[in-house]
């Protein structure tokens, strides 16, 4: 089979541990050919000598400005150039056999290509990584509700990572298959004997890794733990939220002496940090988006043979050594319970082997077996699904102003350097002096 995989995450983001990259790799390892489409070029593109090729939207004709506008949920020009460039790349890379396009998120520049792809005999699969119907309320403007509605109605096959998200996809009467996330065990198996990271230990040492975004990380819950258990140390690994309009996790928690920020760590270093911790944390906020998630970090924590204390995610209770709380005080008790739990490593490894990405790819292949693409007339590019509100437009304008200020600072530095060397006198416009 030939797959076209659309991902809003870069191929190498989070060390390539995320669903779209791992599913694409697993399909390629099974001998299927895969063309992976990411927003902009990854820093690393290791295809492991597999029948696998990676291309970015910006390499297919979408300008950086158009991509940035799409990320803010604003209208972009018709991506017809992208569609033709993509088809040309696809035709060169893949033979003329069964064609399957996988969409992992309702991103406007991707979804608008659906009729164009149908006209070229693609089967359309929507494999939802999250409950994107709940995403806009949390400020994730790149996922348009109308784009997801279109995908849900038009896709030949619907899949989701949790039963909750599958139920949201079934709102128009179709059946959705549940295919959870998986785990790349090799990262953790090859580093089992690595020395633990040298971090400040407490009576209990708690760890977390992931992006520090308020829609996915309950800072108030972690503050409660830090305040009620000052003898415990909490270590947070992850990049800060780049969006200034959202509450800052770091600003909220930096007052606590028993909370330590380590920034983003290479994915291959995560086992060392886990080895230094007693319990790993998944402090999710209480919202619909949380209830639709199947967090990769949970599988990674388990692969490191660590018990997990999570919050507001009842879908995780079926996983071994994952303890889920529904209130702040329950979260404290859950951490203590997890710390007292002895992990049976062999039994856990047997369980995790069944959660491999190869198994997930096999389940996906079963869902598309014997499915015939819906016959549709026309192959036009869809109009934009963007419908930004005033707040979104203001955030975009503020971002442009920040970039302008950064550019002006850069120009002033160049100007000063040039003046010192007797070069050009001015890069920036200046007002004429009054007499």
Predicted regions and their residues:
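Membrane-proximal helix-turn-helix segments that form the acceptor-binding/catalytic region
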Residues: 140-158
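Nucleotide-sugar-dependent
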Residues: 14, 18, 213, 266-273, ...
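A charged, aromatic-enriched C-terminal amphipathic alpha-helix characteristic of glycosyltransferases
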Residues: 340-373
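Conserved donor-binding/catalytic core segment of Leloir-type glycosyltransferases
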Residues: 198-216, 222-226, 235-237
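Nucleotide-activated donor-binding/catalytic signature segment of Leloir-type glycosyltransferases, i.e.
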Residues: 238, 246-271
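Boundary detector for helix-to-coil junctions that initiate low-complexity/charged tails
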Residues: 374-435
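Carbohydrate-associated surface elements
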Residues: 164, 179-185, 191
């Amino acid at each position: 089979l030939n797959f076209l995989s659309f991902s809003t995450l870069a191929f190498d983001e989070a060390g390539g541990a995320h669903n779209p990259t791992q599913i694409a790799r697993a399909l390629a390892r099974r001998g299927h050919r895969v063309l992976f489409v990411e927003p902009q070029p990854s820093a690393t593109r290791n295809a492991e000598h597999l029948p696998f090729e990676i291309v970015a939207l910006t390499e297919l004709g979408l300008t950086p400005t158009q991509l940035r506008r799409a990320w803010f949920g604003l209208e972009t020009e018709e991506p017809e150039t992208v569609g033709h460039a993509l088809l040309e790349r696809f035709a060169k890379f893949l033979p003329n056999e069964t064609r399957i396009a996988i969409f992992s998120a309702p991103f406007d520049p991707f979804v608008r290509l659906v009729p164009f792809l149908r006209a070229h005999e693609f089967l359309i699969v929507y494999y939802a990584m999250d409950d994107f119907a709940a995403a806009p309320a949390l400020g994730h403007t790149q996922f348009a509700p109308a784009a997801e509605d279109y995908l849900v109605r038009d896709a030949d096959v619907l899949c989701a990572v949790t039963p909750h998200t599958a139920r949201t996809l079934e709102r128009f009467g179709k059946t959705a298959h549940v295919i959870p996330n998986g785990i790349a065990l090799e990262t953790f198996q090859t580093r089992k004997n690595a020395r633990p990271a040298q971090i400040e230990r407490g009576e209990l040492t708690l760890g977390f890794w992931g992006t520090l975004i308020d829609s996915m990380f309950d800072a108030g819950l972690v503050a409660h733990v830090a305040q009620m258990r000052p003898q415990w140390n909490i270590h947070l690994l992850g990049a800060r939220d780049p969006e200034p309009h959202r509450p800052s996790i770091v600003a909220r928690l930096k007052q606590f002496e028993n909370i330590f920020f380590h920034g983003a760590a290479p994915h291959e270093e995560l086992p060392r940090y886990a080895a230094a911790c007693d319990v790993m944390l998944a402090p999710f906020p209480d919202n619909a988006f949380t209830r639709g998630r199947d967090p990769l970090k949970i599988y990674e924590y388990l692969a490191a043979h660590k018990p997990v204390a999570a919050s507001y995610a009842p879908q995780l209770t079926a996983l071994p050594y994952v303890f889920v709380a529904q209130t702040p005080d329950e979260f404290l008790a859950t951490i203590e319970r997890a710390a007292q739990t002895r992990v049976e490593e062999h039994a856990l490894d047997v369980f995790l082997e069944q959660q491999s990405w190869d198994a997930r790819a096999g389940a996906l292949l079963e869902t598309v077996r014997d499915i015939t693409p819906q016959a549709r007339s026309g192959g036009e590019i869809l109009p934009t699904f963007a419908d930004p509100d005033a707040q979104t437009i203001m955030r975009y304008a503020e971002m442009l102003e920040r970039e302008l200020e950064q550019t002006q600072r850069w120009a002033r530095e160049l100007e000063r350097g040039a003046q010192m060397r007797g070069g050009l006198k001015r890069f920036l416009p200046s007002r004429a002096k009054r007499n």
